[in-house]
């Protein structure tokens, strides 16, 4: 595995706000664009962060399982789309999402496979965390995460990485560039012809992301994550030591 490089400076104020909010009684919305496996996993383990008030699940796609999940867990369902608008009007989209969140008193966001990139003013008003299918401590020559964006797993495979991992980070406007909170254990990449990218992603979610996300939320809810101990690493067991 590659050695981590020095992490560029991020907005520490966002993390401090998140840490403080999570120790109180945050009103939470989950954002998703896909199947919702991480969203379901987080909701099924909500007893681990009992002070969290889950209010809504938001999506940008009608084909997701968002409505079914919201109905199952008694949450509001928010669907915001922009039919036929080319190019995508990011400001208008997030202004509409923000209106919903303000009305519901949302003050903490959990991103679970949400594919839209929010603008800075939205992120400042509604701070949140995201899980990303790559080890974001691996850096490129510019000091930015080497495997960022929607094709991160594909980039890692093409680069010949022998292991993959997932990272939880503060959401900032730079894609996958926010403060790294935790890194999952590393998953070896099987080498055989029938193993495809989708299968790898599902294995990564099941083996790495599903244990990690609720664990980090539980630690945040109890005030056990401080800026000076980040990033936490499941590989080194310092996550387990806090439980």
Each model region followed by its residue ranges:
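One-carbon transfer enzymes
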Residues: 1-243
């Amino acid at each position: 595995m590659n050695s981590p490089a020095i992490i560029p400076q991020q907005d520490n104020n966002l993390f401090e706000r998140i840490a403080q909010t999570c120790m109180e009684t945050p009103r939470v919305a989950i954002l998703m664009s896909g199947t919702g496996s991480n969203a379901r996993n987080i909701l099924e383990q909500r007893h681990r962060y009992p002070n969290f008030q889950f209010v809504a699940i938001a999506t940008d796609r009608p084909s997701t399982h968002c409505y079914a999940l919201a109905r199952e867990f008694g949450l509001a369902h928010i669907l915001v789309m922009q039919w036929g608008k080319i190019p995508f009007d990011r400001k208008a989209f997030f202004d509409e999402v923000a209106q919903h969140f303000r009305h519901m008193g949302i003050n903490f966001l959990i991103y679970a496979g949400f594919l839209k990139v929010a603008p800075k003013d939205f992120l400042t008003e509604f701070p949140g965390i995201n899980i990303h299918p790559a080890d974001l401590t691996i850096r490129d020559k510019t000091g930015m995460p080497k495997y960022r964006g929607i094709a991160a797993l594909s980039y890692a495979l093409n680069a010949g990485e022998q292991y993959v991992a997932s990272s939880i980070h503060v959401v900032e406007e730079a894609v996958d560039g926010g403060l790294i909170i935790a890194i999952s254990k590393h998953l070896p990449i099987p080498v055989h012809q029938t193993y495809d990218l989708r299968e790898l992603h599902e294995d990564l979610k099941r083996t790495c992301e599903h244990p990690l996300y609720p664990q980090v939320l539980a630690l945040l809810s109890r005030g056990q994550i401080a800026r000076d101990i980040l990033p936490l690493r499941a590989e080194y067991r310092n996550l387990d030591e806090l439980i």
